[in-house]
């Protein structure tokens, strides 16, 4: 997902083109409900990772004087509500292609005013889809061939510059609390301290893992 501040298309362009910006995250309720198979779509390990990631994101955004709105309601309810209350003019979000995510996106678009400018983008790939040198029907069936062609013919796009810190007046007066594991029906737990792969959530930890892996 795109829960980071650095090299983020939406964050960079919103900061560049809008006088005030706010970040929004929804804990979609149905992802934490029991399924007919007797387990949740999002269980305790993934939930802990997500909570850690949001704590990191909230801290990073606060350094830029940007509020992270954390919502326990569906985005189909929360986004239209905050668009109205905060008088939002532009909405930035990452494109997805899977059904559940697109159902949410479609519902949000139907629920908000057509005057809202919607900006969508692909920000989750090493290579941007528009930069791939293959036509759709000519993409190799074998990954190695695809990879070698991309390495030879396609350049990874440059990262977006870091945004300038907003004035403190950009922050909302309300402080949004990140839920705890217990709020989702899980008991608090701690990964084994001797684990070789603790995988703590958050972009800073992600960068550190990448650095350790490559260097």
What are these regions (language model features)?
Residues 1-157:
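Trp/Phe/Arg-rich N-terminal binding region typifying the photolyase-homology
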């Amino acid at each position: 997902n795109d829960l980071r501040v650095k090299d983020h298309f939406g964050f960079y362009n919103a900061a560049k083109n809008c006088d005030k910006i706010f970040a929004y995250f929804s804990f979609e309720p149905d992802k934490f409900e029991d399924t007919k198979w007797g387990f949740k779509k999002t269980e305790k390990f993934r939930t802990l990772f997500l909570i850690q990631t949001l704590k990191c994101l909230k801290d990073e955004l606060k350094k830029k004087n940007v509020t992270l709105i954390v919502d326990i309601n569906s985005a189909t309810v929360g986004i239209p509500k905050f668009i109205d209350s905060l008088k939002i003019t532009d909405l930035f979000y990452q494109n997805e292609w899977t059904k559940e995510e697109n159902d949410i996106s479609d519902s949000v678009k139907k629920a908000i005013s057509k005057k809202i400018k919607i900006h969508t983008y692909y920000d989750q790939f090493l290579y941007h889809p528009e930069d791939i040198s293959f036509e759709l029907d000519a993409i190799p069936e074998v990954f190695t061939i695809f990879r070698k062609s991309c390495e030879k013919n396609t350049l990874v796009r440059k990262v977006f510059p870091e945004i300038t810190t907003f004035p403190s007046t950009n922050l909302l007066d309300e402080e949004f609390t990140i839920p705890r594991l217990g709020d989702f029906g899980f008991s608090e737990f701690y990964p084994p301290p001797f684990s070789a792969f603790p995988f703590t959530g958050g972009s800073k930890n992600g960068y550190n893992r990448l650095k350790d892996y490559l260097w």
